[in-house]
UniProtKB/Swiss-Prot annotation:
The lineage of its organism: Bacteria, Pseudomonadati, Pseudomonadota, Gammaproteobacteria, Enterobacterales. It is a multi-pass membrane protein. Keywords: Cell inner membrane, Cell membrane, Membrane, Transmembrane, Transmembrane helix, Transport. NCBIfam families: PRK10650.1 (NF007934). SUPFAM superfamilies: Multidrug resistance efflux transporter EmrE. Pfam families: Multi_Drug_Res. Forms a complex with MdtJ. This is Spermidine export protein MdtI. GO terms for cellular component: plasma membrane. It comes from Sodalis glossinidius (strain morsitans).
Length: 109
């Protein structure tokens, strides 16, 4: 596999941003009651998977998927907190810490 370079990292970062956008739009669509927001959410998911498919051309699939999912979860938690006033329980915080530690271990491996 090629080296973890800026080009493929850019696609991975784009995939993360699009995934977060999709999650936010899905929440705002109110279960597709606001159809246009729901459709934008689906478009963002399609974009996220397209970007991820480009990222894995230069990043091992296991690493790319773990980082994509991990950063997506962490940032979606932050977005939920900031935009929708959602809070994590202490168990949720423990899970987030474990997730971040796992991502760090994968990145350093």
């Amino acid at each position: 596999m090629q080296q973890f370079d800026l080009y493929h990292s850019g696609f991975l970062a784009s995939a993360v941003v699009l995934e977060i956008l999709a999650n936010i739009l899905l929440k705002m669509s109110d279960g597709f009651r606001k159809l246009w927001l729901g459709l934008l959410s689906l478009l963002a998911v399609l974009g996220a998977f397209s970007a991820l498919s480009q990222a894995v051309k230069g990043i091992d699939l296991s690493v790319a998927y773990a980082l994509w999912g991990g950063f997506g979860i962490a940032a979606t938690i932050a977005a939920g907190w900031i935009m929708f006033n959602q809070r994590l329980s202490s168990r949720g915080w423990a899970g987030l810490v474990l997730l971040l530690i796992g991502m760090l271990v994968i990145k350093l491996a």
